[in-house]
Amino acid sequence: MSLDQQTAAPITPPGPAGRWFRRRAGAVAGFLLTLAVTFLGLLAITFFIGRVIPIDPVLSVVGDRATKEVYEAARMAMGLDQPLVMQFLSYVGHVLTGDLGQSVSTGRPVIEDLSRFFPATFEMATLGILIGVALGVPLGVVAAARQGSWLDQLIRVVGLMGYSVPAFWLGLVGLALFYARLRWVGGPGRLDIFYDGLIAPVTGMILIDSLLAGEIDIFWNAVSHLVLPASVLGFFSLAYIARMTRSFMLDQLGQEFVTTARVKGVPERVVIWRHAFNPIRVPLITVIGLSYAGLLEGSVMVEVVFSWPGIGNYLTTALLNADMNAVLGATLVIGSVFILINKVSDVLYRVLDPRAR
C-alpha cells in the first residue's frame, strides 16, 4: 500500500441533514428555473401580441397627421427599425429593469399606473375569492352528501349559472336592484365623491388605508361600494369551487374506508367532514388558487360595469386608445400574477401532500 493510500482520508457519505439539504436545494433550484422559463415565455407572448395586434404603436404616439420624417424619427426612437430579435432582447431588458414605457392615455410611466390601479383589482378579487370559498366549499359538501336531492339539484343549477351568465349582465342587474332600487349598497366607484381623496394612499387598498388612517366612516363607505362587485366575482368563484368540491366529495364518499366508517356506526357528520372532506383539502388548494388567479385576470367586465379603477378598467381604456405600452404592461402584470399564484398553490400542494413530493 502506498503512502498516499495510507494518508488519504476516507470519504464519508453525507448524513440525513446533508441529503435533506441537497433535496431542498434541488427543489428550490428547479422551482426557480421553472418560474424563470415560464416568465420568459410570458414575455415572448406579450411581445408577440404587441407585434400581431393591428395597431401602429408609432401612430399612437405621433398622431395621424404627423409627417413622414416625424414618423420615421419616432419609429427609430422606439427601436422598431431594428431586427425582431433585437427588439425582443431590448424589450426583455427594459422589463427586467422595470421600464414598461410611457402611457399615451395618462402621460405617466406604465409601471406607475399599474402600481396605482392594481391594488383596487387585488382588493376586489381577494374579497371575491373569500366569498367564493366561504360559500362554495360548504355548498359543494352539502350537494355531495345529499346527492340527487332537490338541494343538490339547486346547487348544480347555481354552478351551471356561474358558467353561463355573463358577468356584465349580472353586474348591471345587481346595480339596478341593490343600488338603484333598494339602496342597500353603494354605487359605481370605490367611494362616494365627498370621501374621495380624504385619505393618503399607503397600500392602495381603501379598506386597509382607511383603517390605518382611523377613518371608520370611509371604511364602511368603501365596504358598501366593494360588496356588490366582489359578490359578482365571488358568484363565479363560488360556482366553480362548489362544482369541484362536489366532484371531489362524491369520489371520496364512494371509497371503502367511508363505507366501513358508516358500517361501524360513525356519525354521518363525522364521516362527511373528517373521513371524506379531509383528503380533498389538498386538491381544493389548487382549485382555489386557479379560481383566485381567474378572478384577478377576469375582472375586466366587472370593473367596467362598476367604474372600478382597477387594472381591468385600465386595460380596457388602453385598448380603446391604442395605448400599446399600457396594454402590454397590464397583460404582463396579469400573466405574472397568474403564474405566481399557480406556483404558490403548487408549492402548498407539495408541502401538504407527501405523495407529491
Language-model segments: residues:
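Alpha-helical transmembrane segments of integral membrane proteins
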Residues: 24-26, 42, 118-151, 198-357
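Cytoplasmic-entry segments and transmembrane alpha-helices of multi-pass inner-membrane transporters
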Residues: 23-32, 139-174, 282
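An internal, D/E-rich "acidic patch" concept
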Residues: 2-5, 12-24, 59, 81-137
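Helix-terminus/capping and membrane-interface signal
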Residues: 18, 34, 38-46, 120, ...
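Hydrophobic alpha-helical membrane-insertion segments
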Residues: 39-44, 162-183, 288-292
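Hydrophobic alpha-helical segments of integral membrane proteins
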Residues: 24, 28, 32, 70, ...
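Transmembrane alpha-helical segments of polytopic membrane transport and secretion proteins
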Residues: 1-35, 147-148, 152, 347-357
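Hydrophobic alpha-helical transmembrane segments of membrane transport/permease proteins
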Residues: 38-89, 178-218
